[in-house]
């Protein structure tokens, strides 16, 4: 019954039920059946996450007694509940915790489907942090090629995540076309996979811009995605807004492009603030800074200091290095040699490429929400 309510998007009903359980206002006999209790708490938290109420979900978890732990995984629902807690760490910017939790959960997993979910979350958080992109790529590639499972969601996301890392590294030899063709085949084989189209479109646009060097096609692709998403509140819509802002910032020095870029960055930033997504928020703020520098406007130095501190604290390593890059531009300082060597080692190809360009060209650094 609870699952049916979730599938039918009756999130507020599940939240109301969850609130009653948390306040102890539900039938006390419920607690005699631990699995029944877990279902109520699980769908309560799932509903909060669907509505972007990540911090509320965090508060519920932090304020309630932890009535079971990793030693107690003896059914699918207990696994799913623990996996949700690991994903909550990811969604609330505790990436290192999510990595540790997903690795521990992997050891307790009893089915292939459970194992691949843990592996995907592990690689996904590695990609966010950006300190071991090659390991993340290896995990995504293995998941993309594996024939031992049938989870299309994991496969599609693994394929485009692997491609996204190679695009970030500016690998021109990677077979991006094959990746997008494979995803298209998976989507065409099952109508239920249509929901993943906007997510794929985002990466296809980055491919068109960075690898094919065709900003006009990238803009067209992103605009098509917006037409699909305009009436929704899905997070991916704001990722698309961010990518459009990037295209308008970089490819033409026109006043109307400044205004369009600023508007899309601002939409993405405000959404990210609402759901406490500091990855998207800080990238949007850094994009606005590069935009203003390009057009000769002032930037918020105090905000830049905050981004440097917060991205360092949250282990958002790529964002942190973007902020340091901008700090050097503002101070009119050369990029320190040790920093350039670090970017080369980490394969932060855009930072390495644009750090050697003229000052006016430095503003065209392509930012990536990993």
Where are these regions (language model features)?
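Short coil/turn connectors between adjacent alpha-helices in alpha-solenoid helical repeat scaffolds
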Residues: 2-15, 46-57, 86-97, 124-136, ...
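Amphipathic alpha-helical segments of tetratricopeptide repeats
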Residues: 19-29, 62-70, 99, 103-110, ...
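Structural signature of alpha-solenoid helical repeat junctions
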Residues: 32-36, 73-77, 114, 132, ...
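Residue register of alpha-helical TPR repeats
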Residues: 36-39, 76-80, 117-119, 124, ...
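Solenoidal tandem-repeat scaffolds enriched in leucines and small polar residues
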Residues: 114-117, 121-178, 192-199, 203
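Eukaryotic tandem repeat interaction scaffolds
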Residues: 190-313
């Amino acid at each position: 019954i609870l699952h049916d309510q979730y599938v039918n998007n009756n999130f507020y009903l599940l939240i109301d039920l969850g609130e009653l359980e948390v306040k102890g206002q539900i039938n006390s006999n419920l607690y005699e059946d631990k699995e029944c209790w877990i279902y109520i708490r699980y769908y309560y938290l799932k509903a909060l996450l669907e509505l972007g109420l990540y911090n509320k979900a965090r508060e519920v978890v932090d304020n309630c007694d932890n009535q079971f732990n990793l030693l107690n995984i003896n059914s699918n629902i207990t696994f799913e509940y623990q996996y949700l807690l690991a994903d909550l760490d990811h969604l609330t910017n505790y990436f290192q915790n999510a990595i540790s939790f997903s690795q521990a959960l992997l050891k307790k997993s009893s089915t292939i489907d459970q194992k691949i979910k843990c592996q995907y979350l592990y690689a996904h958080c590695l990609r966010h942090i950006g300190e071991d992109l090659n390991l993340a790529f290896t995990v995504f590639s293995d998941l993309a090629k594996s024939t031992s499972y049938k989870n299309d969601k994991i496969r599609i996301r693994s394929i485009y995540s692997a491609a996204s890392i190679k695009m970030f590294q500016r690998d021109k030899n990677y077979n991006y076309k094959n990746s997008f063709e494979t995803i298209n085949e998976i989507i065409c084989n099952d109508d239920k996979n249509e929901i993943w189209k906007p997510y794929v479109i985002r990466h296809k646009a980055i491919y068109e811009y960075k690898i094919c060097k065709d900003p006009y096609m990238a803009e067209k692709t992103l605009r098509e995605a917006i037409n699909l998403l305009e009436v929704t509140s899905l997070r991916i819509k704001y990722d698309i807004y961010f990518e459009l802002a990037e295209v308008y910032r970089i490819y033409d020095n026109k006043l109307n492009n400044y205004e369009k870029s600023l508007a899309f960055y601002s939409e993405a930033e405000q959404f990210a603030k609402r759901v406490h997504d500091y990855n998207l928020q800080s990238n949007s703020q850094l994009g606005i800074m590069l935009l203003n520098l390009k057009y000769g406007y002032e930037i918020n130095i105090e905000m830049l200091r905050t981004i440097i501190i917060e991205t360092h604290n949250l282990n958002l390593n790529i964002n942190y290095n973007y902020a340091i890059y901008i700090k050097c531009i503002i101070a009119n300082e050369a990029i320190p040699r040790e920093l350039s060597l670090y970017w080369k080692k980490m394969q932060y190809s855009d930072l390495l490429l644009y750090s050697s360009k003229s000052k006016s060209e430095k503003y065209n650094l392509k930012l990536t929400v990993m």
